[in-house]
Each structure stands twice: as C-alpha cells, then as structure tokens.
C-alpha cells in the first residue's frame, strides 16, 4: 500500500490522525505566511521556531500512526 493511500485512509477513518493532519496543515500555512515577510521581528522569529517545532512534532505523531497502520495491514495478510 502506498503512503498516500495510507494517509487518505487514516484521514477518513482515524479522528486523531485527521486532527493531527489538519493541525499540521494549519501550522504549515502559518509558517508560510511568516516566511513571506522580508524581515522578521524577534517575536516573529521566536514564533517561527515554535511553529517549526510543533509542526515537526505533529509530523512525528502522524508517522507513528502510519507505521502502526502498516503493521496492522501486514499482520492481517
């Protein structure tokens, strides 16, 4: 099963994954907004770093759910 197929299945069937995915997208949008600016204030730079950390944490959590899903599929076959 391809990664995108797993992501689509989890987005449809797993509330936790869907929540993480949506939050990750929201953080990505926020980060993009900050990166569009020519210069960042000190506060914006701190916010950018915090967003990057939060985004990475969400991505790690989603990766774990994908790994668990793959494991369940392999065990079922």
Stretches found by the model and what they are:
Residues 1-77:
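Extended, charge-rich alpha-helical interface modules
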């Amino acid at each position: 099963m391809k990664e995108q197929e797993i992501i689509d299945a989890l987005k449809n069937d797993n509330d936790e994954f869907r929540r993480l995915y949506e939050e990750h997208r929201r953080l990505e949008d926020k980060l993009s907004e900050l990166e569009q600016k020519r210069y960042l204030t000190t506060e914006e730079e701190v916010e950018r770093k915090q967003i990057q950390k939060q985004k990475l944490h969400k991505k790690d959590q989603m990766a774990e759910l994908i790994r668990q899903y793959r494991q369940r599929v392999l065990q079922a076959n």
